[in-house]
Amino acid sequence: MKKEFDFILIGRITIDFNPTDYYNNLENSSLFKKYIGGSAANIAIGLSRLKNKVGFFGSVSDDQFGNFVLNVFENEKIDISRIKKTKDHKLGLTFTEMLSEEKSTILMYRDNVADLQIDVSDIDLDYILRTKILVISGTSLAKSPSREAVLKALFLAKNNGIKVVFDIDYRPYSWKNLDEVSLYYQIVAQNSDLIIGSYEEIQLTSRFCLENPENLIDDDYAKYWLKFVDLIIIKNGKKGSKLYQKDKKLVAKIVPVKMLKGYGGGDAYASLFLDHYLKNESDLENGLALATSAASIMVQSHSSFDLPDYQKILEFKDNALKSDPDLVQKKEWNAFKK
């Protein structure tokens, strides 16, 4: 059956305000540029720019900011037929504080936000059956009714042979406590095909299913989660990232660059990797090299969604490999070998 969409995403949409008078405290910043934000929104835009057909389950405010989001999505050729407007809730606002090349913080306003108002009635099987891959962003599990909507989408996809990607995307705001986080993350992770998360996010996801998870290393987590998923990526900031399958382990370094800000690379990383995973799953080494290259490009950019075209990323990756042929290394690995 021919699929209309390559990817459908469900998750966070926000409005970002990034200072143009950066390397300054927020209290001293007076000039800001407005962008669409939120991990799921950024990844959707990245995937669409890579010539994928993209859909989205979401909820936005019924106001000027909601209209801004829908206009951006339409301009980026993302289907908005399953994005509803809510009159009683506002989109979350994110103000970024770019203190230096290395240090950035965020100030968020996420009380009763619009993106968490997607409901089980907004999720329909017909739309899910039209995609090859469903991408779930973990922030959408933070509160009801969004978390129930996500779980419905998850199980509809799983029961109908649609691949599920879980991008953990942990943000402490909106959650009541860590037990709640770990519980819902574990449910989704154990029913996914692919997990992407930082070491800290994987640790948080594993609190109820592994003993003393704080004492475990990447390999330990991979051995456990590969009982459920086909592939797991564990990111470790400046130390790079690792990709695991049952019989494959790849270790990727970062590409050193002069940073403008200390955030924004993760969404570009996910966009490039998922694009390559769908189109050329047999060559994951190249996919990981593209992903880590895209992340390095994005930390030089003022926004978190302004992904350059594929040719520029490819050229950046090729130059990085010339400088360091061991940018991505294959390691001996078998997850279930005694």
UniProtKB/Swiss-Prot annotation:
Catalytic reaction(s) noted: 5-dehydro-2-deoxy-D-gluconate + ATP = 6-phospho-5-dehydro-2-deoxy-D-gluconate + ADP + H(+)
- List S-S links within the chain: none
Enzyme Commission code: 2.7.1.92
Q: Does the record bear ATP-binding in its keywords?
A: yes
Q: Matching CDD domains, A to Z? A: KdgK
Name the Pfam families on file: PfkB
Residues in coiled coil: none
Read off the InterPro entries from this record: DKG_kinase_firmi, Myo_inos_IolC, Myo_inos_IolC-like_sf, PfkB_Carbo_kinase, PfkB_dom, Ribokinase-like
Per UniProt, the keywords (alphabetical) are: ATP-binding, Kinase, Nucleotide-binding, Transferase
- Enumerate the SUPFAM superfamilies for this protein: Ribokinase-like
Annotated metabolic or biological route of this protein? Polyol metabolism; myo-inositol degradation into acetyl-CoA; acetyl-CoA from myo-inositol: step 5/7
- Molecular function (Gene Ontology), one example: 5-dehydro-2-deoxygluconokinase activity
Family designation = Belongs to the carbohydrate kinase PfkB family.
NCBIfam families (alphabetical): myo_inos_iolC_N (TIGR04382)
Describe the task this protein carries out: Catalyzes the phosphorylation of 5-dehydro-2-deoxy-D-gluconate (2-deoxy-5-keto-D-gluconate or DKG) to 6-phospho-5-dehydro-2-deoxy-D-gluconate (DKGP).
Q: What is this protein called?
A: 5-dehydro-2-deoxygluconokinase
Which species expresses this protein natively?
Mesomycoplasma hyopneumoniae (strain J / ATCC 25934 / NCTC 10110)
Organismal lineage: Bacteria, Bacillati, Mycoplasmatota, Mycoplasmoidales, Metamycoplasmataceae
**Which gene is annotated as encoding this protein in its UniProt record?**
iolC
